[in-house]
């Protein structure tokens, strides 16, 4: 968890990971920020939903800043040791188009935020952000907790890799983002993968109902 990222902290530094009020807030803050300002965007430890998402957002913000907020900077604090999706493409694009805008930093997990001073801290720096987009570490939703499918201390749900049946509770199947990569392999948490998992799972469930080995 990130120190200070409670309700007040989230109000100042929204994740804006799902479309809605927070994405509108982030846009409005970017529009209102004066030229020469500093935007800070954090990337959580993987795995998380939509691996290229934070880097796509960084590219869009950088493009906006370059066109409309001259002299502004975007500091990308990546918790990971490198860009974890399409890294070569993003780095090439950033170097070519936004080298004067993007300051990309690896191994820079956010450990603390101070909403009163708009400060975002890593183990190396304290950065004052005119606009802050802090995306915290992700886990499976509260729904799986209500069903008891996520073991304590784990972020995702372990499943059988052939049937997607929970290894915690029999006859319950989990697909998509909620599955644990240590049991399904290093597949991205994407819509395409979830769709594919659903088809495999449906076939497995039919086989199980009919007493056929999967």
Model regions: which residues?
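Conserved active-site and cofactor/substrate-binding residues in soluble primary-metabolism enzymes
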Residues: 21, 52, 56, 85, ...
């Amino acid at each position: 968890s990130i120190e200070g990222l409670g309700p007040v902290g989230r109000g100042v530094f929204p994740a804006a990971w799902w479309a809605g009020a927070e994405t509108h807030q982030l846009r409005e803050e970017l529009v209102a920020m004066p030229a020469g300002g500093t935007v800070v965007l954090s990337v959580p430890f993987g795995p998380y939903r939509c691996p290229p998402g934070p880097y796509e957002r960084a590219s869009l913000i950088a493009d906006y800043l370059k066109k409309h907020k001259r002299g502004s900077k975007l500091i990308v604090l990546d918790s990971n040791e490198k860009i974890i999706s399409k890294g070569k493409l993003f780095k090439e694009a950033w170097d070519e188009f936004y080298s004067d805008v993007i300051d990309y930093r690896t191994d820079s997990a956010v450990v603390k935020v101070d909403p009163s001073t708009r400060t975002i801290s890593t183990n190396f720096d304290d950065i004052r952000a005119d606009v802050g987009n802090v995306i915290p570490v992700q886990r499976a939703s509260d729904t799986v907790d209500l069903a008891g499918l996520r073991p304590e201390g784990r972020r995702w749900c372990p499943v059988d890799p052939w049937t997607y049946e929970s290894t915690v509770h029999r006859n319950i199947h989990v697909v998509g983002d909620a599955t644990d990569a240590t049991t399904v392999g290093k597949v991205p948490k994407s819509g395409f993968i979830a769709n594919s998992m659903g088809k495999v799972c449906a076939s497995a469930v039919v086989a199980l109902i009919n007493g056929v080995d999967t």
